[in-house]
Structure formats: C-alpha cells, structure tokens
Amino acid sequence: MKSTLSSILSLIVSSSSKLPYVSHYSYDFQHGWLNIVVSEYKSQKTCGDIRISNNELQYKLFCGKENGKGMIPLSKIKFKYEKDIFSAQSIISGKIFFSVKCTQEQYRYIEKYIKK
C-alpha cells in the first residue's frame, strides 16, 4: 500500500514538474489587462500567454501537453493555486483550461487581479 502511494505521488510530482512556467508578467494600465508570459519547461523559450481583464480570460498556450486557446468570461472560471501550480478550471464542466508552474510571489501578484 505504501509503495503504491509513493509511486502515485512520484508520478504526480514528475508530471507537474514538467509544466510550463510563468516567466514574467505585467499589468497594462491603458487596456486593463494582466499579461502573463509562459515559457517551456527547462527553457526560456516563450510558448504562450495568459491575459486577464476584470471580466475575461484569454489564453494561448503551445507548450507541450499544455496546448489550447480561448476566451472565457471570468464568471465561468475558478482559479486555483496549489503546490506551485496556477490553473484555471471551468465552473460548469470542470475542464481545466491550463496549468502552469508559478511561484508564491508571482501568484500573490496575479491574485490581486483575479480577485477584483
């Protein structure tokens, strides 16, 4: 039982550690968007971006297994931060739109804009 649990946990950790990561972010005061740039795992190569306004999420990711794009009203999304992973999930279907590695410091900055 213990070895099975250890195997499952190591699989979860290894797959989550290969996620793309938040490389930098900025707030565009002119247009009211938080712009988050995402880079590939173990690289500085940009592979997507996430934009959050006061009522909408726009994302475009082409980062290995984290692929997708969309525009979704914030009222239909639940943001989550757990174990250095920032994700957005549909409140209706439960579908996870994206998951990216993110430090606590980065998330504290992002959180200011998603909790407005």
Protein language model features and the residues they cover:
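Acidic, Ser/Thr- and proline-rich intrinsically disordered linker/docking segments
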Residues: 83-116
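Phosphoinositide-binding peripheral membrane targeting modules
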Residues: 44-49, 54-79
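Beta-strand-connecting loop/turn residues
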Residues: 32, 55, 82-86
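Anionic N-terminal interaction surfaces
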Residues: 4-48
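A composition-biased, non-transmembrane "mature-region" signal
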Residues: 28-29, 40-47, 64-66, 87, ...
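Short amphipathic alpha-helical segments that mediate assembly, nucleic-acid/protein binding
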Residues: 2-6, 106-107
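Short hydrophobic/aromatic-rich beta-strand segments that constitute the beta-sheet cores
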Residues: 36, 57-61, 88
